[in-house]
């Protein structure tokens, strides 16, 4: 029986553990979480979702307040065409965040940033180009292109001095999506350094329709590996979505030929995660029936989350002036639905109106009200111990990472704090 640590991931000659922690936004995969994994030689993601607002909270900047004030005149406008991000501010926020991160890196591991194309920010190509290049200029170890086909992303970076230096990868959910990306990126003369294949059991946005259950991670990994082999391409493939233990990771690698694993849900409840303790406890207490896939996101992608997510029962006025990360040509499905609801509410009983289909994802993600999780989140109770007061002991991120690497079969090592707690509370719930 093998442990994940007996395998290795080769990224352009650099040998690393075959495990990446996923980039969970907004600021769930915090800098502290990523740095704790990097310090032990691991691979960790941060997320670039809503970085101006993240910087405001971390560094006391005023990017969000400045944008809200500048765009205040359009608050009652039905379409937000003029509510644009200041590209200089976007660049400054990304630079500040990434520079702060990289200044504290040890160099033992690899720090990556997850960049979502679906954050169109009312000027998709301009803002995406700014975000990508600012991250490169600030010294990020690599960029994982997520939530979109990214048909233009390599072209947007090709003039950057670090275009061939930094590690660049992409998340796909089919060989078709990968083929489109490679064809459009070919003129740059650059191949991705790794490919993350995200299956239907992942948390958050899914790269499938509501027929997601018809797909499987092993089948897609094999499909992508065959696609690459047919074209003579040797690019590491990372399997993601639903891999809960080190033993499962080994099984996926051995059965599919994957070169590594990406995991996220177990890191969401780590001590260094940005989620509030109440959300982490909800994850630990979750049952299978609490985990749902819905159309709450205005991006058009299905999302997997806990049904207890506060956002699902809280329709808020669109905050496009302050945020507007999902605006595209001045509109988004939630903004449109809000306008229609307000029109229907004129002279009507609001309580009788149907519930909103979508949510203001910018606001709710920023406030940690969307509790996204993988399909196996109900197993989190296996990974720790519940205290007498009902709260759960949170593992350190490095403990989660090391357990993935070192555990064999179905075993899961308890956090050190949980082991100590059990010595004085042997009856504690696990």
Model-found features: residue ranges?
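Residue-level detector of alpha-helix initiation sites
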Residues: 28, 243-244
């Amino acid at each position: 029986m093998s442990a994940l640590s007996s395998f290795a991931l080769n990224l352009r000659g650099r040998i690393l553990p075959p495990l990446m922690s996923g980039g969970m936004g907004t600021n769930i995969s915090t800098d502290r979480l990523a740095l704790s994994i990097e310090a032990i030689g691991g691979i960790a993601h941060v997320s670039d979702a809503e970085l101006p607002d993240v910087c405001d909270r971390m560094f006391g900047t005023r990017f969000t307040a400045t944008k809200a004030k500048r765009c205040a005149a359009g608050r009652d406008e039905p379409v937000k065409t003029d509510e644009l991000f200041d590209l200089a501010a976007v660049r400054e926020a990304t630079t500040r965040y990434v520079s702060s991160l990289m200044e504290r890196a040890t160099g033992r591991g690899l720090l990556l940033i997850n960049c979502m194309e679906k954050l169109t920010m009312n000027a998709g190509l301009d803002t995406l180009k700014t975000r990508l290049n600012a991250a490169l200029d600030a010294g990020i170890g690599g960029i994982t292109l997520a939530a979109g086909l990214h048909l233009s992303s390599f072209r947007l970076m090709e003039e950057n001095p670090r275009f061939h230096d930094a590690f660049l990868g992409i998340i796909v959910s089919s060989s078709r999506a990968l083929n489109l990306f490679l064809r459009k990126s070919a003129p740059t003369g650059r191949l991705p350094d790794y490919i993350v294949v995200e299956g239907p059991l992942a948390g958050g946005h899914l790269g499938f329709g509501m027929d997601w259950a018809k797909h499987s991670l092993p089948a897609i990994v094999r499909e992508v590996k065959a696609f690459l082999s047919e074209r003579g391409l040797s690019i590491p493939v990372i399997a993601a979505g639903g891999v809960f233990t080190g033993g499962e990771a080994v099984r996926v690698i051995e059965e599919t030929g994957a070169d590594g694993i990406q995991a996220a849900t177990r890191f969401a409840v780590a001590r260094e995660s940005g989620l509030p303790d109440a959300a982490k406890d909800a994850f630990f207490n979750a049952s299978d029936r609490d985990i749902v896939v819905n159309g709450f996101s205005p991006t058009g992608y299905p999302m997997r989350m806990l049904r207890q997510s506060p956002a699902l029962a809280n329709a808020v006025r669109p905050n496009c002036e302050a945020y507007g990360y999902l605006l595209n040509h001045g509109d988004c499905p939630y903004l449109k639905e809000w306008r229609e609801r307000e029109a229907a509410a004129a002279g009507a009983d609001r309580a009788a109106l149907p519930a909103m289909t979508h949510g203001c994802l910018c606001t709710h993600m920023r406030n940690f009200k969307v509790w996204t999780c993988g399909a196996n989140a109900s197993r989190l109770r296996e990974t720790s111990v519940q205290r007498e007061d009902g709260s759960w002991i949170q593992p350190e991120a490095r403990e989660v990472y090391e357990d993935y690497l070192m555990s064999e079969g179905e075993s899961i090592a308890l956090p050190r704090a949980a082991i100590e707690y059990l010595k004085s509370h042997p009856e504690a719930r696990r």
